[in-house]
Each structure stands twice: as C-alpha cells, then as structure tokens.
Design a protein with these regions (language model features):
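Beta-strand-turn-beta hairpins that frame and shape the catalytic cleft
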Residues: 1-4, 106-112
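Core catalytic region of metal-dependent phosphoesterases/phosphodiesterases
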Residues: 2-99
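Residue-level detector of flexible, active-site-proximal loop/helix-junction positions
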Residues: 10, 105, 120
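Structural preference for beta-strand elements that scaffold enzyme active sites
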Residues: 56, 102, 111-113
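Short, flexible active-site-adjacent loop segments at beta-strand->alpha-helix junctions, enriched
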Residues: 61-63, 102-104, 117-118
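Active-site-proximal segments of metal-dependent phosphoesterases and phosphodiesterases across multiple
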Residues: 74-81, 111-123
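Short, charged beta->alpha transition segments
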Residues: 97-109
Length: 123
C-alpha cells in the first residue's frame, strides 16, 4: 500500500490541489495528520474534500480550536483572528466532523499517525 500523508492543510485549497496534482497516481490511500483547518480561506471546501477522500484523519490543535474543543487564547494575534473567522464560517456538519476527529496516535497498517507527536497531539 502506498500512502499519501497530508498534514497541516490549514484550509488552503490551492496548496492542497497542488500537492494532489504532484502526487497523482503515486498513492493508493490518503491519510491526514491533522490541522485540516486554521489560517486558510477555504475551511468548508477543504473539510468537505477531506471528509469525502481521506478515510483516516487525526485531529490537530487548529481543528480543536476552530471547532471550539480547545481554547485558542495562547495563539498569536493572527491565529486568534483566523480561529474566530473559521469557527464562524464552518458549516454545522463540518464543525461536527472536526469535533469528532480522533486524537492520535491512530494505528494504520503497522504504523501510527499523530499530530504533534505520539506522546502528545500538541507537542
């Protein structure tokens, strides 16, 4: 099995499309190590795409903050503004999806995926 491992997409549809184009026909399955949203201008488009195309996703710190699971008070000013905007922009279905993402590590085919580190998702 050949995996395309994505992480820190941060709602950047344009960059996601560039990565997918570069990797075209060179993977069997996509995995995501979190931070689907945060910073970028396309939180719903990216989340919709991830929901439809990525069977295994773990949550990242921005997924938690943007969906209201975790406080973002320690974020820098730009990240705070982005988090508020993303939270207000997400559809209810995408908000629920992000809230339901599992904490890593998650075992996949003999290895683990995580956001941060296997010891802590925020490391």
């Amino acid at each position: 099995m050949r995996y395309l491992i994505l992480s820190d997409i941060h709602a950047n549809q344009e960059a996601l499309e560039a990565v997918l184009e570069h990797a075209r026909n060179r993977y069997d399955e996509i995995l995501c190590c979190g931070d689907v949203v945060g910073y970028g201008p396309d939180p719903n488009r990216v989340t919709d795409w991830v929901r439809s195309n990525v069977p295994t996703v773990v949550r990242g710190n921005h997924d938690k903050a943007c969906s209201g699971i975790e406080s973002f008070e320690d974020y820098n000013p730009a990240a705070k503004l982005s988090t508020v905007w993303t939270n207000q922009s997400l559809t209810p279905g995408n908000m629920d999806y992000l809230r339901a993402l599992p904490q890593g590590p998650v075992a996949v085919d003999g290895f683990d995926i995580a956001h941060g580190s296997p010891a802590g998702e925020d490391d």
